[in-house]
């Protein structure tokens, strides 16, 4: 199995631009024979999305970009990180797996690291189960 471990610098907190770049790099990996392309944590937004996550319109833009990436996935699996909201207003730092045009799995980060700013704990809820 050939894996593509993709590092790239997100275009700030622009989910649409980041989704376009992820899709471009994903397609390049698939063309080069990768069976799975793996992108970083919060690849869709950048790790410093912070206060933007409190805005519903921003969360909706992120969700739309996730749906777009899932729909564009093919035989090569696509793994990437993005913030997603549940139906009760909680936001999770998620690891997503898509293939064949579908979002097949979403894992919510269980353990939120603590940094001096308390960043992860201010903006994300911890997941409740290993999945």
Predicted regions and their residues:
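Enzyme catalytic cores with a strong preference for nitrogen-chemistry domains
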Residues: 1-131
């Amino acid at each position: 199995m050939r894996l593509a471990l993709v590092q790239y610098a997100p275009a700030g907190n622009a989910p649409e631009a980041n989704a376009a770049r992820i899709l471009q790099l994903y397609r390049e990996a698939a063309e080069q024979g990768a069976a799975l392309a793996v992108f970083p944590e919060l690849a869709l937004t950048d790790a410093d999305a912070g206060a933007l996550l409190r805005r519903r319109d921003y969360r909706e833009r992120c969700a739309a970009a996730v749906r777009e990436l899932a729909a564009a996935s093919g035989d090569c699996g696509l793994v990437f990180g993005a913030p997603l909201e549940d139906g009760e207003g909680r936001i999770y730092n998620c690891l997503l797996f898509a293939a064949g045009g579908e979002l097949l799995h979403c894992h919510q980060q269980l353990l939120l690291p603590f940094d001096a700013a308390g960043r992860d704990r201010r903006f994300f809820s911890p997941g409740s189960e290993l999945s």
